[in-house]
């Protein structure tokens, strides 16, 4: 994929070379917490070069193998109607199991991918164009939507918007499948304006009613659950939407939204809150939105403009965003090259921390930000750190059991650790995963800083460890006579580790 087309002309500031802190900041903000070798690889690049490198390495397909059942067609309407109550309960249990397996597959992809930005943006669109397990019964449908978000993660927003409007998961989740002439359902029409494009206050109830008429006839086949258009249920009459009049269908309605300058600004503001800070700078935001719209809604162009703002690189905006549960768990695993047997335990931890993938709390998705942290989730985050250190194996030590480990006879999914290490630029022999559990080779990781788990770290090593894992100085005082293991664990327990 070409990167240069989306990159604006560089300002002098964008020619500044990255030091280690800059590299850690950029890779953490645009992906997940990076391994030390990832940071070392980009130190010395200019800001413009790292932006181009990151946008030029995005993917459209996963690198991991996903469950075979994703390709299975759902049962037909006749097959569903023929189920007995006992069969329905069994089918429900199987669907729930498959949803869990789907969550595990996605978390595994987040850990292994050589393009963390791809998965961050896939996750971003999952929270933006919300659909969920509570109204989408078959996980195959949600898997197809996830694949759509990955394919178009950094493509064209207009293309993505049109595709999402015809996506079977979305048609089920926002009741678009039941929208027909004479009985319009306004759910999707309202949410596409309020949550997906314009934002609150930029449309009227009349616009919602008319837009719903335009969307009539877009539904799903009851047997295949695939998108289809039914002309006999479409309202072909004239509609007036946001001041424009015509016999619009669903595509015509979406094109009206894409012509509105407010759509580019709404998406740019949401990207700002994802990658820069909770409060966008109005002038800089206008610049990003203008470039986004002028590019024809090229998502890479929006990100290139965003990451070229002074605000993005301003040291005052470092460590001001809270890591989502997925970022916290996946970032920790990537940062410390943690091996694992079954990715289900990682997906379960993400859910425990408050982000149940494929099951957002409501149509607005996860609120995010500071709301990720409360007394319960903070305790769970600390317990995950403790779990990592219980999974430590140094010379003469064995990996202990932990509460999330499945029984010994459980099926395990061995992560391709060697592939991950290669992608991350790690040298040496990768750690072997404990069966069904985690394995953190602390001794090998600390050796990068000439430290040992049971030896006193010393001031120089302590400073190196701080800069390797934190965006800010630790909030709490840490005993300067700590061993390497104790000091690193204290850093991960510090509030600063929750931030990016």
Where are these regions (language model features)?
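Short alpha-helix boundary/capping elements
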Residues: 31, 59, 129, 133, ...
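Short linear loop/turn motifs
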Residues: 40-46, 227-229, 350
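A general structural motif at alpha-helix termini
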Residues: 43-46, 54-55, 164, 306-310, ...
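Hydrophobic/aromatic residues in well-formed alpha-helices
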Residues: 23, 39, 47-51, 208, ...
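Flexible, low-complexity segments enriched for small/polar residues
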Residues: 3-36, 264, 268-295, 304-500
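Active-site substrate-binding loop specific to GH73 endo-beta-N-acetylglucosaminidase modules
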Residues: 2-9, 82-87, 95, 99-106, ...
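N-terminal accessory alpha/beta regions
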Residues: 34-152
